[in-house]
Amino acid sequence: MNTFSQVWVFSDTPSRLPELMNGAQALANQINTFVLNDADGVQAIQLGANHVWKLNGKPDDRMIEDYAGVMADTIRQHGADGLVLLPNTRRGKLLAAKLGYRLKAAVSNDASTVSVQDGKATVKHMVYGGLAIGEERIATPYAVLTISSGTFDAAQPDASRTGETHTVEWQAPAVAITRTATQARQSNSVDLDKARLVVSVGRGIGSKENIALAEQLCKAIGAELACSRPVAENEKWMEHERYVGISNLMLKPELYLAVGISGQIQHMVGANASQTIFAINKDKNAPIFQYADYGIVGDAVKILPALTAALAR
């Protein structure tokens, strides 16, 4: 048997749902999708869900992952085994851990390949910081997986599809974290998964102010702006949602223009599926040039304005 009888899907990030649904179609005969609102439910059915389960009634001071109890109950009530697919976001991984505990299921994070053999999930993901690929065969009846961005192509919506809609009511967990306050995070809308062209900056750009040079190039060619992990996590120059690498975004754009990025393996596993890689780096021995189809050795601060002017003509 090379498919599960059913798969359960949830995404806290709407842009990740289409790819999870495409993966679900390949892995199971019946697709169940948990959603947070009616609009997401309509989208899920158009993407191929047979059953939509609307999570309802959570108090404002509780976290989404506190739905884990009723989600696990629903999953158990509809089969003695099954596959759960979640995005490898921070919330996705928190929810995966809670579901794994409640379902007595193995949890595998950051999956880059998923297949079914003899009714059991076989998962591949990067190990040793991206230096190797590990393979796991999950033996528990339920399997909970968080999926790396780009593992599956995005499913295409079909308005003619139909499905059944159900409601799952909130039940307060015995122990939970209560949210006492919220602070709005300054963040731009990011949809890098769908970008055809990506300009990505590393610490070689020199300063936060110099990122404006890359932004101008993005505007000139219609690209999205991304970055390496150190730019987001260490320097705090850009949002976490924009960094490319093994523990975050795995992109497949037509063009990936790496600016001031050294090209360490942990970054390149997130960009190496690009159709064309163009690198700008002043270090001629930078590892990025081993991956690049085209490259310029030089100072990005001087090259970017000239490149923008040429491409904007």
UniProtKB/Swiss-Prot annotation:
Gene3D superfamilies: HUPs (3.40.50.620), TPP-binding domain (3.40.50.1220). Pathway: Amine and polyamine metabolism; carnitine metabolism. FAD binds at residues 255-283. Heterodimer of FixA and FixB. Keywords: Electron transport, FAD, Flavoprotein, Transport. Required for anaerobic carnitine reduction. May bring reductant to CaiA. This is Protein FixB. GO terms for biological process: carnitine metabolic process; fatty acid beta-oxidation using acyl-CoA dehydrogenase. The keyword Flavoprotein applies. PANTHER family: ELECTRON TRANSFER FLAVOPROTEIN ALPHA, PROTEIN FIXB-RELATED. It comes from the Bacteria. GO terms for molecular function: electron transfer activity; flavin adenine dinucleotide binding. HAMAP family: FixB (MF_01056). The gene is fixB. Belongs to the ETF alpha-subunit/FixB family. InterPro entries: DHS-like_NAD/FAD-binding_dom, ETF_a/b_N, ETF_a/FixB, ETF_asu_C, ETF_asu_C_CS, FixB, Rossmann-like_a/b/a_fold. It holds the Pfam family ETF.
